[in-house]
Amino acid sequence: MLDQRLVRDNPETIAQQLGRRGKAVDLTKLQLIAQQQRDLEQQRSGLQAEGNRIGKEVGQRIKSGADPKGDEVAELRQQGNAIKQKVAVLEEEEKQLSSELKQQLLGFPNLPSEACPDGRSEDDNVEVRRWGTPRVDDGLYEHWQIAERLQLFDTERSVRIAQSRFVTLMGQGARLERALINFMLDLHTSKGYREVLPPVLVNSASLTGSGQLPKFAEESFRCAEDDLWLTPTAEVPVTSLHRDEIIPADQLPLRYAAYSPCFRREAGSYGRDTRGLIRLHQFNKVELYWFVHPDHSDEAHQRITADAEAVLQALELPYRVLDLCTADLGFSARRTYDLEVWLPGAGAYREISSCSVCGDFQARRSSIRTKEGKATKLVHTLNGSGLAVGRTMAALLENGQQSDGSVLLPKALVPYVGRERLQPE
């Protein structure tokens, strides 16, 4: 959430920065509410100062010999009580305005970092680096074709069980999925991450804190009777691990690695990636999440990105890193590096991780602070996929496919799967 003071005092700057995202914004209503709130604050402060003056005067007059029950003191006390009533009315009006302002602010995305490249679409994303040599053999199959031959998952029966865009992993496919989850968690915890297995159902406050609500309500699955939602990413519950908390500065950074099934409606993606594991309503993901001191968030962004890259490197999967332009940034992000893995069957790079620094945007929405001495300030948060498991499986199938129909697995994964290659059963 944006800082109310910035909106009130520097609306031109806010409008300019949000404009870098490629959308014109109208802050008129926000400014009006913020100014009304400021006027009420000044009125209340003036009345409270007058009330304090009257209270002191009552004490002084009694000390000077005035009758505590006399008309002179009674009149002053009556004035003081009248002021208290006015203050109470103003406080209620302030409370209502504050709530209205917050609801308005919840709909605005984060301000992009100054370092974030400007752009109008994903075509303006900037490639930072590549790793590995992309395989470009002729006659390679896409992952869903390989999976059909190896009987790794069953989509037809999944439609019967649920609907389209669900998949039931079978046999070697289920084993490979489980192996990837364990491999990713082991790799991250070996680097000091604390493993988390959060609830899959989260409340509205959690989704609001991380930035999914109110903007993305239609893209999430909801259990309306209980005010619970199926989490779209472990970023949501992990953000709320420390909601409404003050984290001592000497405990930062906090680094978590959280496995969770994720659920998304994928609204607006009709007709895209209809086969295979790329775009599903339910998928597994290992999420990396950092709570850091504000002074260290840029450094942490490089580190969390490197930790996500380490998974791809260990699995010998070629990839590239993109610095997303302002128009392609996610709602809560100040700056994002996308990792795109090479899929030789599809002949394209596809997103497999987004590593974002969110500044104090989520911390303000979730009231997560740190304390140094007597001063408190909002922490900064970062998140990144480490990795999306289904897309990782797709990349392994396409990059490891052999002419005999088998799939050769990377050495790092063999102990987890218990075999060197996947073959028709």
Curated annotation (Swiss-Prot):
A Pfam family reported for this protein in Swiss-Prot or TrEMBL: Seryl_tRNA_N
EC number: 6.1.1.11
SUPFAM superfamilies linked: Class II aaRS and biotin synthetases, tRNA-binding arm
CDD domains linked: SerRS_core
Keywords: Aminoacyl-tRNA synthetase, ATP-binding, Cytoplasm, Ligase, Nucleotide-binding, Protein biosynthesis
Primary localisation category: cytoplasm
UniProt GO molecular function: ATP binding; serine-tRNA ligase activity
Residue positions binding ATP: R264, R265, E266, E351, I352, S353, S354
Subcellular location: Cytoplasm
This protein's pathway: Aminoacyl-tRNA biosynthesis; selenocysteinyl-tRNA(Sec) biosynthesis; L-seryl-tRNA(Sec) from L-serine and tRNA(Sec): step 1/1
UniProt GO BP: selenocysteine biosynthetic process; seryl-tRNA aminoacylation
Record-level GO cellular component terms: cytoplasm
InterPro entries reported for this sequence: aa-tRNA-synt_IIb, aa-tRNA-synth_II, aa-tRNA-synth_II/BPL/LPL, Ser-tRNA-ligase_type_1, Ser-tRNA-synth_1_N, SerRS_1_N_sf, SerRS_core, tRNA-bd_arm
Binding site for L-serine: T233, A234, E235, E287, S385
Catalytically driven reaction(s): tRNA(Ser) + L-serine + ATP = L-seryl-tRNA(Ser) + AMP + diphosphate + H(+); tRNA(Sec) + L-serine + ATP = L-seryl-tRNA(Sec) + AMP + diphosphate + H(+)
PANTHER family: SERINE--TRNA LIGASE, SERYL-TRNA SYNTHETASE
Family: Belongs to the class-II aminoacyl-tRNA synthetase family. Type-1 seryl-tRNA synthetase subfamily.
Function summary: Catalyzes the attachment of serine to tRNA(Ser). Is also able to aminoacylate tRNA(Sec) with serine, to form the misacylated tRNA L-seryl-tRNA(Sec), which will be further converted into selenocysteinyl-tRNA(Sec).
Domain text: Consists of two distinct domains, a catalytic core and a N-terminal extension that is involved in tRNA binding.
NCBIfam families: serS (TIGR00414)
Subunit structure, interactors included: Homodimer. The tRNA molecule binds across the dimer.
Protein name in UniProt: Serine--tRNA ligase
